[in-house]
Structures are given as structure tokens and as C-alpha cells.
Amino acid sequence: MLHSDQGVQYKSNKYKILLCRYEAMQSMSRRGNYLDNSPMGRVFRRFKSKWLAKGGYGDFSHAVRDIKQ
């Protein structure tokens, strides 16, 4: 999932096609509502404090494994 604001670059068809290619879902804040970002903020805080606190990852597959747990 990719969360963004409502910038024009995030609404373009090229951008949406790129997300689709990588099977990513788009989440977008409502105009002027910063609170829409809070759920994703919690996810990233947890990611940084729990998973990255170990010193990072040697490769992408290890990161994916931990995130799925």
C-alpha cells in the first residue's frame, strides 16, 4: 500500500499504471486532512522501532518475511 497526498503526480494515469504493475494499492488523503495519514504513520513508526531497530536487513526477502509476520 502506498499512501500519498493529492498531488497531481499521484493522480496521473502513468503513476496508477506503475502502481498496478507492482500490485500496489493506492491510498490518498482527503484534501486538507492531515489526519488521514495517521494510520500509515503508525505502521511506519512500528516498522522503524521494531524491525529496523535490529540493524536493518541484508536483503529484501528478509524484510518481507518480517513484515508478513
Swiss-Prot record:
Name of this chain's protein: Uncharacterized protein YuaL
PANTHER family given for it?
A: TRANSPOSASE INSF FOR INSERTION SEQUENCE IS3B-RELATED, TRANSPOSASE INSO FOR INSERTION SEQUENCE ELEMENT IS911B-RELATED
Q: What UniProt keywords are attached to this protein's entry?
A: Plasmid
Q: Which InterPro entries match?
A: RNaseH-like_sf, Transposase_IS3/IS150/IS904
Q: What lineage, starting at the top, does this entry show? A: Bacteria, Pseudomonadati, Pseudomonadota, Gammaproteobacteria, Enterobacterales
